[in-house]
Amino acid sequence: MTVRIAINGFGRIGRNVVRALYESGRRAEITVVAINELADAAGMAHLLKYDTSHGRFAWEVRHEREQLFVGDDVIRILHERTLADLPWRELGVDVVLDCTGVYGNREHGEAHIAAGAKKVLFSHPGSNDLDATVVFGVNQNELRAEHRIVSNASCTTNCIIPVIKLLDDAYGIESGTVTTIHSAMNDQQVIDAYHSDLRRTRAASQSIIPVDTKLAAGITRIFPQFNDRFEAIAVRVPTINVTAIDLSVTVKKPVKASEVNQLLQKAAQGAFHGIVDYTESPLVSIDFNHDPHSAIVDGTQTRVSGAHLIKTLVWCDNEWGFANRMLDTTLAMAAVGFRLDASASTKL
């Protein structure tokens, strides 16, 4: 079965989803039938072909009127502002990947379904009333056919949750703090300009900028047992891609740094292969650009204090890794089938 998807929003994540689909060789499993984006077709084609972070796309890209051609594939281009007007039923869409960053609650998901989509996957955490929030590699096996409106969480949640699970299963986490060192994003300014967040009025290329984060809430959404036991802060730094996360946890069992690294390296080679990677090479952020893993543990930075306080540094390509997980979750949603009875929905 080939899953027919539509993409709503062709920004950083939407474009990387298309690139990842073609580069990963999954076109026999997933077909993009339509992209809804308010920008014009010429701009869409150009930014798909040329990307400052990820380089030139290897596939031929062109557009004619309201059609985007990727190799021999034809993708319909839409410019609808209203979700109810999207022709998902006409196009036979199985799953909508909503990558706008604007929509993310149950009402928005139901609008896609009313327009004819069978399921919806949001590219950000979304509201608490969705059917499921999935961190692929950790809880995708809990998906059911009735889970129609799903969130793929965030790039940072996908990065840190597998590591938290591994440490908790092995040593028992008491509490933790997280600092996200995140590349600049397009909600920041090129030069000083107005923004509702006064820190984000400042030029992104000239400062390390503290911003709000809901990562702690994202952790407890996946692991409710950690409610009020994790806190998170975030800063944006003057790079355009790749993120590092500084994770500190207190654990019940005494442990050594070498044992932590052995645990994480074994997981990267085994149960979490393809999701978690492990390195002890002397690398910097640019070296993780275009890395498809959700998390890359930097074993050179693991520390243990007093046998119970663990500090780790985890890298991720916040665009490419997350785009690959969007594809993984899409296939997982399709694999459990499509149940169209809305009353049967049960929350994960």
UniProtKB/Swiss-Prot annotation:
It comes from the Bacteria. Its EC number is 1.2.1.72. Keywords: Cytoplasm, NAD, Oxidoreductase, Pyridoxine biosynthesis. Its main location: cytoplasm. The keyword Oxidoreductase applies. It is found in: Cytoplasm. Substrate binds at residues 154-156, 200, 213-214, 236. InterPro entries: E4P_DH_bac (IPR006422), GlycerAld/Erythrose_P_DH (IPR020831), GlycerAld_3-P_DH_AS (IPR020830), GlycerAld_3-P_DH_cat (IPR020829), GlycerAld_3-P_DH_NAD(P)-bd (IPR020828), Glyceraldehyde-3-P_DH_1 (IPR006424), NAD(P)-bd_dom_sf (IPR036291). Gene3D superfamilies: Dihydrodipicolinate Reductase, domain 2, NAD(P)-binding Rossmann-like Domain. Pathway: Cofactor biosynthesis; pyridoxine 5'-phosphate biosynthesis; pyridoxine 5'-phosphate from D-erythrose 4-phosphate: step 1/5. One of its GO terms (molecular function) is NAD binding. NAD(+) binds at residues 12-13, 81, 318. It holds the Pfam family Gp_dh_N. The record marks 182 as: Activates thiol group during catalysis. The active site is at 155 (nucleophile). It catalyses: D-erythrose 4-phosphate + NAD(+) + H2O = 4-phospho-D-erythronate + NADH + 2 H(+). GO terms for biological process: glucose metabolic process; pyridoxal phosphate biosynthetic process; pyridoxine biosynthetic process. GO terms for cellular component: cytoplasm. HAMAP family: E4P_dehydrog. Homotetramer. Belongs to the glyceraldehyde-3-phosphate dehydrogenase family. Epd subfamily. Catalyzes the NAD-dependent conversion of D-erythrose 4-phosphate to 4-phosphoerythronate. This is D-erythrose-4-phosphate dehydrogenase. It comes from Salmonella dublin (strain CT_02021853). The gene is epd.
